[in-house]
Amino acid sequence: MKLLHYILTTFVLLSLVACKDSCPEDLWEPRAIGDSLYVQLTLDLLNSSSTTRAVPNGGEEGDGWEYGYTYENQLHNFTVFVLGYNATINSSPNTIFVGKRYFSDDELEKIDSLHQEELNLKGYPEGQEVLKDVTTYEFTIPIVREQAREMPNADTYRFIVVANHGDLTETYHTLGDLRNGMPDKAWTDTSDGPVRFVMSNENDQYHSNGTGTTEDPVCLHVTIERMAARIDYDPTGSTLVSGTPRYDVKGVTPGNEVLAHLYVDRMAIVNGSQQPSYFFKRVADDINGTNLKYLGDETPIARGEATNYVIDPYSTQKTTPPNNELLTTLYGNSRISNAAALVGSDKPTLSLTSNTFPYTLGYVNENTFDAPQAWSYYATGVVVQCRYAPQKHFYTAYNATTDVLTEGAYELNQTFYMVEPNTPTIDESQRLYFQNEADAVAYATNTAKKHFGKVVKYENGVCYYFTYMRHSNKVEVIHNTMEFGIVRNNIYRFKLLPNTGPGTPTPDPRHPEELKARVYVKKWLSVEHPIIYV
């Protein structure tokens, strides 16, 4: 396999088979033998580019990113599609490729070995690599051309790349076919973890020069990006207790007193799209695809709010409340109605080794929908199962006549009954926790002592929180364009800042606007979700 992090130059003579077999004989013919084009193609994995999120500046040219893990960056194989005559990714769907070439796993393994030999000759130890941001290949291409036209000028070539999806040269013969193409899957899950992340062009910009000779090759620079997105949990702010993140819960009243501890046991992605998106990102003015552009830019305004949509293959179906069949097709077993099972007792608990390094929950496909449909049945999010442990305001008895509470010491995993006042805003210092239900009810209904509250039971102290992945909008304005959603090659990272008491005693997928979940979103280089308040 080949990493996309170092520069490599090799010469490969291509017996490139273009689309002649699928094209009318009277329109296309091979270029004359001996009149070949010499090309230097540089593939640049999007590892030093910009964010689509506000960190602090959002949009296609934002400023937040981070490098991917090694297994996310590996290049196993790739197919090159060549456009000529100034054609671009947004040209007519009937546009014919003037050339195609597949670089197989075996070829890249050989190239990798040659590169390692070069390093060894230069004194580098076996296995050590010189890390760069690009990989360069040099090769000759016999071109297929239109009979009625001269050969394309060297500066009119554009290269389209799809990596880690095998040989596509016989699958796609026109630009329209390729643009409508979708991978079988955007990554491959194995017993050792995810591998073979499918990648494709990140933009429609090509840096080219040269005349196409050996001495002056056509130099093309193509930036590629992963089709998958990643969701991370950032445990910063927690203390690890035997690998379990534990948070201090404090009230907002003066004193900064620790009122409870929150132990985070399990997490799972909900509404993770099971359907891969198109090979190339699509943007449009609205969810229906008006003024659709391939590899277009997301365009935010000053506050980070998006002004256009990224379109996935199902976006136009997500403009009204869904039916069960659509939700099952989109999200499979990860649909939010299955949240309880996703963090059930048969699922492993978190066992972290660091409270400063992000923990990857998993990978998801693009998932975008109409802004008015920003509800929990479409939005990709995370369900978090925790144990809540009151440290203050825990009582073992209550005398309703004297209105005297008997304080006690809470034991972790003990069932408790929370009394919460019936007020519009509640601080954690206003909640009371009781060892038995009778005392909790007596206190909550003791109107003679001006107590007005509700009682909630927490079996074994277990509670649940939900949060949903925000893609744009760094202010708390609800239902803006692309506020919630998943876009390729982003890392959606969330923090927990517990300050609102225990979550719900059973999974309760509330609407996104009720969660106050601000999410950091960076390019992969990464997407960070702002702090999620739970």
Where would I find each of the regions flagged by the language model?
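Extracellular secretory-pathway ectodomains of glycoproteins
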Residues: P217-G243
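Tryptophan-paired
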Residues: G64-T169, D234, L240-R488, P498, ...
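Sec-dependent bacterial lipoprotein signal peptides
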Residues: M1-A18
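Structured interaction patches on ligand/partner-binding surfaces of diverse proteins
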Residues: E118, G123-P125, G166-C219
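Hydrophobic, glycine-enriched assembly/anchoring segments
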Residues: I478-V534
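Bacterial Sec-dependent N-terminal signal peptides
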Residues: L16-L43, Y233, N489, I531
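Intrinsic-disorder/low-complexity, polar/charged segments enriched in Ser/Thr/Lys/Arg/Asp/Glu/Gln
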Residues: S36-Q40, V134-E138, P217-C219, R230, ...
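Contiguous beta-strand segments within globular domains
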Residues: P30-W65, A228-D234
